[in-house]
Amino acid sequence: VHLTAEDRKEIAAILGKVNVDSLGGQCLARLIVVNPWSRRYFHDFGDLSSCDAICRNPKVLAHGAKVMRSIVEATKHLDNLREYYADLSVTHSLKFYVDPENFKLFSGIVIVCLALTLQTDFSCHKQLAFEKLMKGVSHALGHGY
């Protein structure tokens, strides 16, 4: 994925306007609610019985925050996302057996949550830049399969 200087600027602007931890929790909760089969990856997270339980689950929120912080850190490695995510890719593949399609699903949910959070400030240019980033992240995480 090729990110232009303008894309990088847009990504930084987006990340500067959101609470990354809150966004991450919201994104992971939505992933689990909208894609119920993904609950199998979080069986030790406690109560995942309803939308409300998932959205308030401290383990879901904490892990979502961790995921988004990883994406923020990845923005420091945009020219080599595959290397940055190499170990995590192998872990998700060999230890957790995560279907790499879930990375794409999560990416789409990040875009939805950004749009809900930023509303009119989430221009088509910002969306394009962040979609490029998330495509790169998804590809890098799926590379260890």
Curated annotation (Swiss-Prot):
Gene Ontology CC: blood microparticle; haptoglobin-hemoglobin complex; hemoglobin complex
InterPro entries in UniProt: Globin (IPR000971), Globin-like_sf (IPR009050), Globin/Proto (IPR012292), Hemoglobin_b (IPR002337), Hemoglobin_oxygen_transport (IPR050056)
GO molecular function, one term: oxygen binding
Residue stretches making up the Globin domain: 2-145
UniProt GO BP: hydrogen peroxide catabolic process
Residues that hold heme b according to the record: 63, 92
Organs and tissues of expression: Red blood cells.
Gene3D superfamilies hit by this protein: Globins (1.10.490.10)
Listed Pfam families: Globin (PF00042)
Keyword Ion transport: no
UniProt keyword list: Heme, Iron, Metal-binding, Oxygen transport, Transport
Family membership: Belongs to the globin family.
Complex and partners: Minor hemoglobin is a tetramer of two alpha-2 chains and two beta-2 chains.
Function comment: Involved in oxygen transport from the lung to the various peripheral tissues.
Name of this protein: Hemoglobin subunit beta-2
Originating species: Triturus cristatus (Great crested newt)
